[in-house]
A protein has these predicted regions:
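Active-site bordering "gate/hinge" segments
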Residues: 1-209
Length: 209
């Protein structure tokens, strides 16, 4: 567990080093993961503390205002009904208009301005992904909401404006990230063997390999 944690945090540190960014300026790191890896996350938190970083961990959004289609950003659990997530990915079509987007953008800007000191010392995400899930082929339902042309343009505008706001307060040239992936039991009967092999590859000496 400790070796896996150190591999993760060292990858984060090296990301800053290779891009010539000063990690010592940063105080927080955003850990994102799938539930079930808490033992590893706890070890990662301690390893990040050795780098002078404290974790920021939050649940992936489930409300229509903040979630990103059916993409999970944060910590999340197994999904018992992927079709439902797919069907409801555009539920914001119920209320999205120009006034809403303007207000949402303003609220995001205000939140970052109020917390600009914290944003300035945020280092970026450390992401633990999973693989081996049973393939999902969604069905297109006529009853599901969709964005009309105007709403699609508003959605793109918000994404662009939100990205600019984030980059203003958490400067891209000063932040980095790391990503690692592990299999989950859905991958099949030889899960343990695959998991052990993945750990072996992930923890190889990076100076040698």
């Amino acid at each position: 567990i400790q070796k896996m944690a150190d591999t993760f945090t060292e990858g984060y540190r090296i990301g800053f080093e290779l891009t010539g960014k000063d990690l010592s300026k940063k105080k927080t790191v955003n850990i994102r993961y799938c539930l079930g890896f808490e033992r590893l996350v706890r070890a990662e938190i301690k390893s990040f503390e050795k780098l002078g970083l404290k974790p920021t961990i939050y649940r992936a959004a489930v409300n229509t205002i903040n979630k990103r289609l059916n993409i999970k950003v944060g910590y999340y659990g197994a999904n018992p009904n992927k079709q439902m997530d797919f069907d409801h990915r555009f539920d914001n079509a119920l209320y999205m208009d120009g006034e809403f987007i303007e207000r949402k953008t303003g609220a995001l800007k205000l939140a970052y301005e109020k917390n600009k000191e914290l944003a300035a010392v945020h280092g970026g995400p450390a992401v633990m992904e999973v693989f081996g899930e049973v393939p999902f082929e969604p069905q297109i339902k006529s009853e599901a909401l969709t964005l009309d042309t105007k709403q699609q343009k508003l959605s793109v505008k918000y994404s662009n404006d939100a990205g600019s706001i984030v980059n203003e307060y958490i400067k891209g040239e000063e932040r980095s990230f790391t990503i690692i992936a592990y299999p989950i039991p859905e991958i099949g009967g030889n899960f343990e063997e695959i998991f052990e092999g993945t750990v072996k590859i992930n923890t190889l000496d990076y100076n040698k390999y």
